[in-house]
């Protein structure tokens, strides 16, 4: 921070100032102005059938295209988790009718700007800063949601207006939401510009019948066209009015699950100009601050001469924090946060740190190599259409020595079932994981060359390993 006082953010002067010297964590809320000016505090998952327009809706609201990778653009599908932040504003002129008084903009927009609607006066003022988690297909979505790699507060369920409802995946998404215990849902009837009014009304009745008796019963159904940005302000209004501000824990020791990591150095960079690795993730609890000493577990994993797993946690320091393009002095739960560290960049390149947990030194949970879980299996495989042969889609019981894929936090690792009885199972993990008793994990099995979600479990206890520490 050249030329300025330390502890005061200099980037984006048009946003609210953050000062570490005066920060009182106990007074922060998910609506504190100095927080939502720069970062999102509410996470909303977008759920829906493939090609029903999830990414387009996110783009219409936030102006951010969540499809970032070349192979995703070519196939027009989302493969990695996409995050996009949006600020939602409300006009402070009471004469302006709803829903026109709501507006959404990208996360670097100033917190107040004058109205441009003819016949109204006053300013648009920031009321919410939300983060959309645009999940690839439902299997990954369910695993992501289940193991809590991101705290989800609400969901947008997308249904395309030009197809009949429900599509096979849609019922799974509802199952996913039920498993997740997500209470707040908005149903968006998209592509309304492609159908006649009678068709839209007919589908509206189909949707009503479909959600009856599920968690989504009573959820508002909003007709929109994401491409034409039609009715997007209604979605903004409902996000403000229908999704309550979630309770957040700002006072605990901070903990972040890494879902992305990268080396930001360009090839041929001078040694003196090298920057440390960057880890990205969603903070589950606590507040991370610039200058804070951090620990990353399990850290560097290796095997000793006897083939036993060893872990060496990485210790480092936070040099920068950012949310999309906004610099932060401190970061609170919600949204995707980038953490610039002094970690060797080669350890971070190309998502190498995914699955690790970052937090305050000495406050992170144990590292497990074996887990004992109480598990719950789904009755049938999701998303497998079975005609005739009904047996194929039934989920078979866990068998001893089979290899499952286990999702814990953001880590996907293999796990061999070493013992199983009734609803308890023991799993030996291929990679060690930093987690704690009581955490939820997702279980997937290989079915016809694909990993399919077959159930979830909760950690009862397990075998932990002591991290090794350098003597120097």
UniProtKB/Swiss-Prot annotation:
Region ranges (G1): 48-55
Keyword Acetylation assigned: yes
A Pfam family of this chain: GTP_EFTU_D2
Functional note: Member of the eIF2 complex that functions in the early steps of protein synthesis by forming a ternary complex with GTP and initiator tRNA. This complex binds to a 40S ribosomal subunit, followed by mRNA binding to form the 43S pre-initiation complex (43S PIC). Junction of the 60S ribosomal subunit to form the 80S initiation complex is preceded by hydrolysis of the GTP bound to eIF2 and release of an eIF2-GDP binary complex. In order for eIF2 to recycle and catalyze another round of initiation, the GDP bound to eIF2 must exchange with GTP by way of a reaction catalyzed by eIF-2B.
GN (gene name): EIF2S3
E.C. number: 3.6.5.3
InterPro entries in UniProt: EFTu-like_2, eIF2G, eIF2g_C, eIF2g_dom_2, eIF2g_GTP-bd, P-loop_NTPase, T_Tr_GTP-bd_dom, Transl_B-barrel_sf
GO biological process, one term: cytoplasmic translational initiation
Modification sites for Phosphoserine: 16
Family named by the database record: Belongs to the TRAFAC class translation factor GTPase superfamily. Classic translation factor GTPase family. EIF2G subfamily.
Compartments in which it is found: Cytoplasm, Cytosol
Main location: cytoplasm
Reaction it catalyzes: GTP + H2O = GDP + phosphate + H(+)
GO terms for MF: GTP binding; GTPase activity; methionyl-initiator methionine tRNA binding; translation initiation factor activity
Enzyme class, first EC level, given as a word: hydrolase
Source species of the chain: Sus scrofa
Single GO cellular component term: cytosol
Subunit structure: Eukaryotic translation initiation factor 2 eIF2 is a heterotrimeric complex composed of an alpha (EIF2S1), a beta (EIF2S2) and a gamma (EIF2S3) chain. eIF2 is member of the 43S pre-initiation complex (43S PIC). Interacts (via C-terminus) with CDC123; the interaction is direct.
Stretches for region G2: 76-80
Residue numbers spanned by region Interacts with CDC123: 457-469
UniProt protein name: Eukaryotic translation initiation factor 2 subunit 3
Region spans: G3: 134-137
Record-annotated tr-type G domain positions: 39-248
CDD domains named in the record: eIF2_gamma (cd01888), eIF2_gamma_II (cd03688), eIF2_gamma_III (cd15490)
């Amino acid at each position: 921070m050249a030329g300025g006082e330390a502890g005061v953010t200099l980037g984006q002067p048009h946003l609210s100032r953050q000062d570490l010297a005066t920060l009182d964590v106990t007074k922060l809320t998910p609506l504190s102005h100095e927080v939502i000016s720069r970062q999102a505090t509410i996470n909303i998952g977008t759920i829906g059938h493939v090609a029903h327009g999830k990414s387009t809706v996110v783009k219409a609201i936030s102006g951010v295209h969540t499809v970032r990778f070349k192979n995703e653009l070519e196939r027009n599908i989302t493969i990695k988790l996409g995050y996009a932040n949006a600020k939602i504003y409300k006009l402070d002129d009471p004469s302006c009718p709803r829903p026109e008084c709501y507006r959404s903009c990208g996360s670097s927009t100033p917190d107040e700007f004058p109205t441009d609607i003819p016949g109204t006066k006053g300013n648009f003022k920031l009321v919410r800063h939300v983060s959309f988690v645009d999940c690839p297909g439902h299997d990954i979505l369910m695993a992501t949601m289940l193991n809590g790699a991101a705290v989800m507060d609400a969901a947008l369920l997308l249904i395309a207006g030009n197809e009949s409802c429900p599509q096979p995946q849609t019922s799974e998404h509802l199952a996913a939401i039920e498993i997740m215990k997500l209470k707040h849902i908005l149903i968006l009837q998209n592509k309304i510009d492609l159908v006649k009014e009678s068709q839209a009304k007919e589908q509206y009745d189909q949707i009503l019948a479909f959600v009856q008796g599920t968690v989504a019963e009573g959820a508002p159904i909003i007709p929109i066209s994401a491409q034409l940005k039609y009715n997007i302000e209604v979605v903004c209004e409902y996000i403000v009015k229908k999704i309550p501000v979630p309770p957040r824990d700002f006072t605990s020791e901070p903990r972040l699950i890494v879902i992305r990591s990268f080396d930001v150095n360009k090839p041929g960079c001078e040694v003196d100009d090298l920057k440390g690795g960057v880890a990205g993730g969603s903070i589950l609890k606590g507040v991370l601050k610039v200058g804070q000493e951090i620990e990353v577990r399990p850290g560097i994993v290796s095997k000793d001469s006897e083939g036993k797993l060893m872990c060496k946690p990485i210790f480092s320091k936070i040099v920068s924090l950012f949310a999309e393009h906004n610099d932060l002095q401190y970061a609170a739960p919600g949204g995707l946060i980038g953490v610039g560290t002094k970690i060797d960049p080669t350890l971070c390149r190309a998502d190498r740190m995914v699955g690790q947990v970052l937090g305050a030194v000495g406050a992170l949970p144990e590292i497990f190599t074996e887990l004992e879980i109480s598990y719950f299996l789904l009755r049938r495989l999701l998303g497998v259409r079975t005609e005739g042969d009904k047996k194929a889609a039934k989920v078979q019981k866990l068998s001893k020595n089979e290899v499952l894929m286990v999702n814990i936090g953001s880590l996907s690792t293999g796990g061999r079932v070493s013992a199983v009885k009734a609803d308890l199972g023991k799993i030996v993990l291929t990679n060690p994981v930093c987690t704690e008793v009581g955490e939820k994990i997702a279980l997937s099995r290989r079915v016809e060359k694909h990993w399919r979600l077959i159930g979830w479990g909760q950690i009862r206890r397990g075998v932990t390993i002591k991290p090794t520490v350098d003597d120097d």
